[in-house]
Amino acid sequence: MSNQDLLYRYLFEEYEVRGELVQLDHTYRHVVEAQSYPVQVQKLLGELLVATSLLTATLKFEGSITVQLQGDGPVRLAVINGDNNQQLRGVARYEGELPSDGKLQSLIGNGQLIITITPEQGERYQGIIALDADTLAGCLEHYFAQSEQLATKLWIRTGYHQGEPRAAGILLQALPAQSEDHSADFDHLTQLTATIKDEELFGLEAEEILYRLYHQDKVRVFDPQAVEFRCTCSRARCEGALLQIEKEEVLDMVQELGKIDMHCDYCGAQYQFDGIDVETLFSRAPDNDANKLH
């Protein structure tokens, strides 16, 4: 597969149904390799990556979506953030022994799925969904049924292709209600899409996948959108965080530890500050008092 980390939107010309297809390679590897996650957590993050990419593709405005799983199980938190530019990042928190079955409820325990939509202009929206389905895809289908009241079906897969981790998924969604009932059309397309195999999703070009699934239907495929891992951490952000603390307290930490190490959980980057760095940072701050929390 030559073109990786792409999201395709497509439309059925004879049906009131739209679709999305995403395939992730480098983005998935960036997320799971940052923390050397166990296989079960890698799989969960891969599913969340696919879900977040498909969800952000539904945005009709500039903004971001955060898809978060949290509960009392071994995986306390798993979260992916993505924006309308298909820039994704994510992290997970886990402790103790992980169940070998890797099932959603086994990993999260008693928990919930939280979807937060944050437009650049306008109010933030948050939906909280019970983990009342066996899979993340099933939980998201319930979310769409409750929030948008549109028939939606998702296929989310993670695995390996030629020894490398891959994640991919498909979303089918009925268009807003028209005067006629198109449920039979949606069911027809759902049955076709359900024949997709993991090796096809991971190894074939998107155009070939869509042809294999829907070659008897007229499908309009739009230009793909690149998907990428993007972390917003920087040394400047770390400096801003340090400036929120009293200078003497920061210097005490340096004296005790030798230096301050700040670690980004999203990308694994390390930022170090020694005594000279701290003195320089506070000396060039325009107004030290204005940068402190009281």
UniProtKB/Swiss-Prot annotation:
Disulfide bonds: 231-233, 264-267
Keywords, ordered alphabetically: Chaperone, Cytoplasm, Disulfide bond, Redox-active center, Zinc
Broad class of the protein's primary localization: cytoplasm
PTM per Swiss-Prot/TrEMBL: Under oxidizing conditions two disulfide bonds are formed involving the reactive cysteines. Under reducing conditions zinc is bound to the reactive cysteines and the protein is inactive.
InterPro entries: Heat_shock_Hsp33, Heat_shock_Hsp33_C, Heat_shock_Hsp33_N, Hsp33_helix_hairpin_bin_dom_sf
Signal peptide: none
Protein known as: 33 kDa chaperonin
UniProt xrefs under Gene3D superfamilies: helix hairpin bin, Hsp33 domain, HSP33 redox switch-like
Lineage of producing organism: Bacteria, Pseudomonadati, Pseudomonadota, Gammaproteobacteria, Aeromonadales
Organism: Aeromonas salmonicida (strain A449)
Family: Belongs to the HSP33 family.
Superkingdom of origin: Bacteria
Coiled-coil boundaries: none
Entry-linked Pfam families: HSP33
Record's keyword annotation contains Disulfide bond: yes
Compartments in which it is found: Cytoplasm
Function: Redox regulated molecular chaperone. Protects both thermally unfolding and oxidatively damaged proteins from irreversible aggregation. Plays an important role in the bacterial defense system toward oxidative stress.
One GO cellular component term: cytoplasm
An annotated Gene Ontology molecular function: unfolded protein binding
GO terms (BP aspect): protein refolding
